[in-house]
Amino acid sequence: MEKLRIGVVRGGISSEREVSLRSGEGIINELNKEKYDVKDIILNNKKDIFSALEDLDFVFLGLHGKFGEDGRIQAVLESMDIPYTGCGVLSSALCMDKDITKQIIKNYDIRTAKWLTVRAGEDYDYDKIVKYLGGKIIAKPNSGG
């Protein structure tokens, strides 16, 4: 019986590249090489992705951030009819936007911690933010990180 050809895509073009390289390495180390033909795909740019994914039966996504979790690599894989790990195009794209994700969660009455989106260039009053959110505050970019 022919081995299933599995590609592990890691690296990528986001600021989370180094984490992605380690994540992908962990996936590769755990795959049974006697059962699967494993192809290590270190993504350095978007232009090589189609040729790198040729002749694969399945893809493990070890990518993080931009072009990894934002729906774009998922769209490429779907256009090539290659099954992959993780969420689909729409859910990946929506979940990369923290503010939209929180609004969707709130819309379905799912409990979530208070949040506040502050956009670049907007004036804000730190004391009012602390009073609204309370206690310790974690600041993160809306997408990535």
Residue ranges: model-predicted function:
Residues 104-112:
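Basic phosphate/pyrophosphate-binding loop/patch that engages nucleotide-derived ligands
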